[in-house]
Amino acid sequence: MELKSFLLRVIAFTLLAALPTVNATPAISLPYPFEADKLYDLKIEQRIGPDSEVRKRANAYRVYLALTPPGWGTGPVCWLAKEVDIDVTQVNITIPADAAPNQSRIRISTAFLKKGAPRSMGFSYSSRTTLVGANATWSQKELDGRSHIDAEEVSCWAFGCARTCQETYYTTKDEEDGPIGTKAYACIKQCAKDLNPRSNGAINGMHMSRILAVAVIIGFIHMVAGVL
């Protein structure tokens, strides 16, 4: 039941990502190239007027990493800053090296939300830039266009670990709804629990090596458990 609820949320998330935004597109300034594991102070202007209807529905925005797996469309895959005050225009962002393959074409995505709400409202995207210094490999699930990692729940510091969960437990498309799918979902949730930042903002770059080490350990533990 928990897995079915999770899959329904992912489907709803995917459909929402495909809808055009009804708000003014934010101005997001990105460096080119964008270095992995480096702390950036990004300028993000939501351009919401003081009397905008948006303010009745939202008082913050979430910042995501958006990827484009080969052969598929672009969409948010993990969050970089969970809650940013709607009028804040400078956001500290670090993209972990294991979040995407090297030389990936990436975007930064934002979405409005009420503080404390688990899910956001619609998505806007920056222009593209290239991620350098990264070391991830596309999982088969991503290449199949069937990733079950929820960008609202999984931070980019837990995303590499969650990708390992998918690689460990999903070997065929027929395994998504049975016991293996349940194990994969539990593994992904554990990654988020252990590696998501405790605060609403981005993690300071000085702690990145420690976080990556923990991600490797968690992924290894689940990999061993999967073959026992």
Where are the model-predicted features located?
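C-terminal GPI-anchoring signal of eukaryotic secretory precursors
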Residues: 172-180, 184, 188-213
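Short beta-strand elements
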Residues: 118-157
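Solvent-exposed serine/threonine-rich low-complexity stretches and specific carbohydrate-binding patches
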Residues: 74-87
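Short strand-edge motifs at loop-to-beta-strand transitions and within beta-strands
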Residues: 89-93
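Beta-sandwich strand segments
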Residues: 115-128, 174-180, 199
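Fungal secretory targeting signals
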Residues: 1-27, 202-228
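Short, solvent-exposed loop/linker segments at the N-terminal edge
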Residues: 32-40
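Internal, hydrophobic beta-strand segments that form the core of beta-sheet-rich folds
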Residues: 100-120
